[in-house]
Amino acid sequence: MLPSQAGAAAALGRGSALGGNLNRTPTGRPGGGGGTRGANGGRVPGNGAGLGQSRLEREAAAAAAPTAGALYSGSEGDSESGEEEELGAERRGLKRSLSEMELGVVVGGPEAAAAAAGGYGPVSGAVSGAKPGKKTRGRVKIKMEFIDNKLRRYTTFSKRKTGIMKKAYELSTLTGTQVLLLVASETGHVYTFATRKLQPMITSETGKALIQTCLNSPDSPPRSDPTTDQRMSATGFEEPDLTYQVSESDSSGETKDTLKPAFTVTNLPGTTSTIQTAPSTSTTMQVSSGPSFPITNYLAPVSASVSPSAVSSANGTVLKSTGSGPVSSGGLMQLPTSFTLMPGGAVAQQVPVQAIHVHQAPQQASPSRDSSTDLTQTSSSGTVTLPATIMTSSVPTTVGGHMMYPSPHAVMYAPTSGLADGSLTVLNAFSQAPSTMQVSHSQVQEPGGVPQVFLTAPSGTVQIPVSAVQLHQMAVIGQQAGSSSNLTELQVVNLDATHSTKSE
């Protein structure tokens, strides 16, 4: 039996199994029974009608025709991903389409083969070169060059802008890093993504002016600066001049129970001005990238009720009152309900052991208050971790606790959880500035004077990291009115480590 007759017999067997025609006879001629699959190099059974030769001719014609890519690429000219594919992708699509046409030749006979050759085969409903039932080409590689087509360019911008914003969010959420992303479209719109610490780069007036200045400037010609090219690369550029220090407490996530300061309130009769141990120099806050700001007054309200027993506030602070003698009237430091003096989980500064002396000055308008109260805060450990980090610049922070920063007439603070809704509290705001608003060690004795705050570190200054809050709409509380209101003097002075009074 000749090879062509063997191929025809094999074709007869397959045709009988598929079509159910047992009386079909081979009509092939020599040389036309065995077709060669050019893409795979294997032989397939011929159908006996000379279609093997025509299939070879179709394959040669498709490989030589310049429009063969349009037949198998499956991409429209105006689609968003209509750029040229890689050569390997075209060959894969061509090979898959040829094999599907051969399947039509074997199964359906000459009519199906002719229909497949004309582009109306079984895969005509879907995109050629893709899997059956899939309408798109999937992931293809496009050229990294400017898209001239305006419609395609706008579509690409919309899709990729959304994608890069999503990637920035995922990076900041998964790894806890600070991300600032700014995308300016050619239509004049600016889209941004920024984490909390980097938001003032966009929200502050200085940052907005800088961004607008850069965007409104004419496009500079390419320079020979190598760092500029590196910044425009796909991997970015590490800025060696913009490194910053990350505190250990931010990464370790220490709990609130690590340090528990003890609060002791002692009622002493008479005047206790001899315990004023703060130095007479004014205290300034040294910010690493800004000028020095004087610490203004923090005036804590004092309740007039006498409580000889321990008082527990809403935030868990225990005030223990112990009387050392007969006292006609005394005072307790009443903390705001949303303010806590206990160390928070994430803090940015640790200072040595300090004690807070709150001295209640006698008021001439209320003659019954002839005694003064001394409030002492000591710590049972070597260092006190302050949760209320004092802020003086305009960069927000995510440290735990509360944020405090000075103003001309009061000290404002806000919990970190309240920054999103713009809540900010002004403690003891005054309608006019008192006569002794400067920070010094002068003891106020004249009537109507306002006591002052002393914050003193071992070297006379307190090093505060660069951080601040956004100025939101303020809610003023604690307005002092009338001559009968009690104002206290809050002093933070240095004490030795021997002051280790423990709270029971």
From Swiss-Prot:
Region of interest: Involved in dimerization: 164-218
GO-annotated cellular components: chromatin; cytoplasm; nucleoplasm; nucleus
Domain MADS-box stretches: 137-197
Compositionally biased tracts (Polar residues): 264-288
UniProt xrefs under SMART domains: MADS
Subunit structure: Binds DNA as a multimer, probably a dimer. Interacts with MRTFA, forming the SRF-MRTFA nuclear complex which binds the 5'-CArG-3' consensus motif (CArG box) on DNA via SRF. Forms a nuclear ternary complex with MRTFA and SCAI. Interacts with MRTFB. Interacts with MLLT7/FOXO4, NKX3A and SSRP1. Interacts with ARID2. Interacts with SRFBP1. Interacts with FOXK1. Interacts with LPXN. Interacts with OLFM2; the interaction promotes dissociation of SRF from the transcriptional repressor HEY2, facilitates binding of SRF to target genes and promotes smooth muscle differentiation. Interacts with NKX3-1.
The species this protein was found in: Mus musculus
Description of the deletion phenotype: Mice lacking Srf in cardiac tissue display lethal cardiac defects between 10.5 and 13.5 dpc, characterized by abnormally thin myocardium, dilated cardiac chambers, poor trabeculation and a disorganised interventricular septum.
Alphabetized InterPro entries for the sequence: MADS-box/MEF2_TF, SRF-like_MADS-box, TF_MADSbox, TF_MADSbox_sf
Entry GO MF terms: chromatin binding; chromatin DNA binding; DNA binding; DNA-binding transcription activator activity, RNA polymerase II-specific; DNA-binding transcription factor activity; DNA-binding transcription factor activity, RNA polymerase II-specific; histone deacetylase binding; primary miRNA binding
Role summary: SRF is a transcription factor that binds to the serum response element (SRE), a short sequence of dyad symmetry located 300 bp to the 5' of the site of transcription initiation of some genes (such as FOS). Together with MRTFA transcription coactivator, controls expression of genes regulating the cytoskeleton during development, morphogenesis and cell migration. The SRF-MRTFA complex activity responds to Rho GTPase-induced changes in cellular globular actin (G-actin) concentration, thereby coupling cytoskeletal gene expression to cytoskeletal dynamics.
Record's protein name: Serum response factor
Annotation: DNA-binding region: 129-218
Region (Disordered): 1-94, 215-288, 359-381
